[in-house]
């Protein structure tokens, strides 16, 4: 996305066709924070949104860490329609997956082998140290 204002008081934007996820100057990768499972208000619409979002993540090569917290951990539950897409992301892009142990416990969700259950303190430190953080909420 490029900002092309015609005057000082006007903002216009030019959208690129392809998704742009820029790395920081030091080559750092993007940290993706998923805080919501999108199923609460409209199941079908929420599932379609999250699957589409995860499908877009699958097409990128610079997601280094995925953090799941709050109801976002519910996408790890058996039978979740997003679990297969998340598995594809893990198999192709190999990001590190951190799950909030408090959230896993609250929602009764098990942490899969490809992820690491960590305390909320570790989650917050990871978020604070992230140079490029994208939040899905």
Regions found by a protein language model. Give the residues of each.
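C-terminal binding/interaction regions
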Residues: 117-118, 126-136
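General beta-strand structural signal in soluble alpha/beta enzymes
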Residues: 68, 98-100, 134-137
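A glycine-rich helix N-cap at a beta->alpha junction
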Residues: 82-108
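Short active-site-adjacent helix-start/loop capping segments
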Residues: 75-77, 106-109
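Conserved mixed alpha/beta catalytic, RNA-binding, or beta-rich assembly cores of soluble enzyme
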Residues: 20-80
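SAM-dependent methyltransferases
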Residues: 1-32
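Cysteine-centered metal-binding/redox modules
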Residues: 123
């Amino acid at each position: 996305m490029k900002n092309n204002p015609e005057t000082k008081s006007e903002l216009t934007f030019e959208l690129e066709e392809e998704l742009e996820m820029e790395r920081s100057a030091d080559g750092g990768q993007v940290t993706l924070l998923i805080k919501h499972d999108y199923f609460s208000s409209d199941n079908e619409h929420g599932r379609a949104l999250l699957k589409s979002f995860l499908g877009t993540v699958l097409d990128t090569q610079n997601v280094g860490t995925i953090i799941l917290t709050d109801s976002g951990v519910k996408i790890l539950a058996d039978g979740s329609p997003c679990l297969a897409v998340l598995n594809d992301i893990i198999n192709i892009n190999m990001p590190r997956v951190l799950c909030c142990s408090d959230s896993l416990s609250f929602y009764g969700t098990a942490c899969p082998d490809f992820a690491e259950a960590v305390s909320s303190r570790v989650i917050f430190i990871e978020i604070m140290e992230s140079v490029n953080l994208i939040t899905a909420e």
